[in-house]
Amino acid sequence: MRRKLRLGLALGSGSARGWAHIGVIRALEERGIRPDVVCGTSIGALVGAAYASGELDRLEKWVTGLAWTNVVRLMDLTWRGGLIRGTRLFTLFRTIFQDREISELPVPYGAIATELHSGRELWLRHGNVLEAVRASCAMPGLFTPVVRDGTVLVDGGLVNPVPVSMCRALGAELVVAVDLSWGKLGPYRQSKDRKVAPREVPGWLDRLRPNWFQGKTHAEGPSIPSIFDVFMTSLDIVEMRVARSRLAGEPADVLITPLLPDFATMDFHRAKEAIAEGRAAVERMGPLLAQVLG
């Protein structure tokens, strides 16, 4: 009788596109595929932690109920190391999810972060789950860095956007990876469904909005993106190139690539679309999944 190989699931970075990971996991479960190891980077660390702790249902219920106004209200402005402090968001997470240690999770789990001063890749395998997720999600310029054990940590997507290597180090013999960087670069588009009544927008955001968050549309020639979109797209380019390089040297056995080209960094209110595309991406890879995983 053939021994069942230990399966790892590597969930990549990708900001709001990361809700596609929920759809990927749901589609894999429907095929009877359940990972033995889960590793994530940035938003992948969040979804991976929810799965590893058995709380994916709670996360899915919360994200599918998000409106753009909810996203705006969770932004707590700071000018120290980033635009958003993140305290409000992660305080909310502590009310939604159980506060656990990584060692207590029923499924082996790890998150990737970057040590800011050295550029070193750090594997977070111990300590509080939400603190590890917060460090892995600390997107430079957007969220403030996290200080952990005397080191300053930022988003793991800078060094390892799709953590196949960590899955294998934790004992995975086969790895299914989800890369969210496919198809995300292209002509600038304004994000969908972002109309918010003035009274619902914090004063600080309303003051920043004209120059920082709103691009300019021209009748002739390409539209000019906002400062925020230029910065975030530049970060996307870096992470995409790093992901291609890492995956060439550390390939997954199955690579799943949700396509969400019109998703902006902060489109967290569009979870239903992302989840549906995550499911569709698994369906596209159905024959290979059957061949590799049996």
Specify the residue positions occupied by each region the protein language model found.
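Patatin-like phospholipase
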Residues: M1-T41, A49-G294
